[in-house]
């Protein structure tokens, strides 16, 4: 999922960038 669309597909790997 894209960090700009967290509701698209929640993965801790996406939020790891934040």
UniProtKB/Swiss-Prot annotation:
The lineage of its organism: Eukaryota, Metazoa, Chordata, Craniata, Vertebrata. It catalyses: an L-alpha-amino acid + O2 + H2O = a 2-oxocarboxylate + H2O2 + NH4(+); L-leucine + O2 + H2O = 4-methyl-2-oxopentanoate + H2O2 + NH4(+); L-phenylalanine + O2 + H2O = 3-phenylpyruvate + H2O2 + NH4(+); L-methionine + O2 + H2O = 4-methylsulfanyl-2-oxobutanoate + H2O2 + NH4(+). One of its GO terms (biological process) is defense response to bacterium. Belongs to the flavin monoamine oxidase family. FIG1 subfamily. Keywords: Antibiotic, Antimicrobial, Apoptosis, Cytolysis, Disulfide bond, FAD, Flavoprotein, Glycoprotein, Hemolysis, Hemorrhagic toxin, Hemostasis impairing toxin, Oxidoreductase, Platelet aggregation activating toxin, Secreted, Toxin. Expressed by the venom gland. It is found in: Secreted. Catalyzes an oxidative deamination of predominantly hydrophobic and aromatic L-amino acids, thus producing hydrogen peroxide that may contribute to the diverse toxic effects of this enzyme. Is highly active on L-Phe > L-Tyr > L-Met > L-Leu, and is weakly or not active on other amino acids. Exhibits diverse biological activities, such as slight hemorrhage, induction of platelet aggregation, edema in the mouse paw and bactericidal activity against both Gram-positive (S.aureus) and Gram-negative (E.coli) bacteria. Coiled coil: none annotated. Homodimer; non-covalently linked. The keyword DNA damage does not apply. It comes from Bothrops alternatus (Urutu). Its cofactor is FAD. Contains 2 disulfide bonds. The keyword Secreted applies. It comes from the Eukaryota. Its main location: secreted. Transmembrane segments: none annotated. One of its GO terms (cellular component) is extracellular region. This is L-amino-acid oxidase. Its EC number is 1.4.3.2. GO terms for molecular function: L-phenylalaine oxidase activity; toxin activity.
């Amino acid at each position: 999922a894209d960090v700009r669309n967290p509701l698209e597909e929640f993965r801790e790997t996406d939020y790891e960038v934040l």
